[in-house]
Amino acid sequence: MKKRKVYSGEAHHVFQRTRNKGVIFYSIHDYLVYFTIYCSQARQRGVSVLSLCPMPDHTHQVIVAASKNQMATFVQTYSHLFAYEWNKKRKKKGFLFSHPFGSAAKLGNKQVRTVLAYSNNNPVERKLVERAEDYRWTFLAYYNNRNPFSLPLNESHAKSYMRMALKEIKQCRDDGQYITYSMLERWESHLSATEWQQLADYIIGLWNVIDYEQAISYYGSYDTMLRAFHDNTGSEYEIREDHDNYTDTVYADCTHVLQAKGLSARQLSAIPSLPLEQKQQLYYYLLSRTSARPAQVKKYLHIALDLTL
């Protein structure tokens, strides 16, 4: 195995693939739990984050760490905490991400610009959005806007339950903790769809540790950075990834089809824990009603890719 090289004070691209190549980000709950864990650990361990982009079955980040040990401890700790919460929600055990994680040092401004474009353009390449900043989970839109995906939130005029939730969220953040699935489910059950999106933006803004100014410094301005992302998708030759030319929109399609079938949010989140027989039934159902390829449906349902059905 190639020995990992970490250069103190330099940007590094870190890539994580799920252990069985299965989907782990099914809903906004998964993204918010991951993000608040990630940001809490970055803040506690002094890691600078230039870019973060969780995708349905993998994640990209560009970070600056003081040492190899600091980077490894950071990645291992947030990965363990997220796996714990994700598994507890689904009554499962085990690792979520493959080990070891992939990383590559980026030395010089050109290399950093290239990998920032690559990381942030992943959702564009996977046909989820037309522009990197339109994907909520690149967090680019939060640089100069605290509510880019919801209506402005006026705390003093919010309903009583919303104010109570905001107070609880602030306390959680001040205590250095992260948001859990049970907290999100409780809040969402008492809020309207509009309020729920406001709360999601509020949580992201409160925990966000991305060093936008440092990322922007490689381009001169925020707008110049975005234009660079629009013009060049970037590249990565030092980390091995399994690429295909298919869109990730099929995972959202699978969710919509199952929702139309009558599956609740709780039932959807339990998909990875279903017995194989039930997964097989859903496998053929999704193949007949979406454009997803067999391997993509298997990844969505957490069926081994080499299993013949």
Name each model feature, range by range.
Residues 58-66:
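Short beta-strand->loop micro-motif that forms the acidic, two-metal-ion catalytic signature
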Residues 1-51, 65-309:
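Short Pro-Cys-Gly-centered "Cys-loop" motif that presents a nucleophilic cysteine in a tight turn
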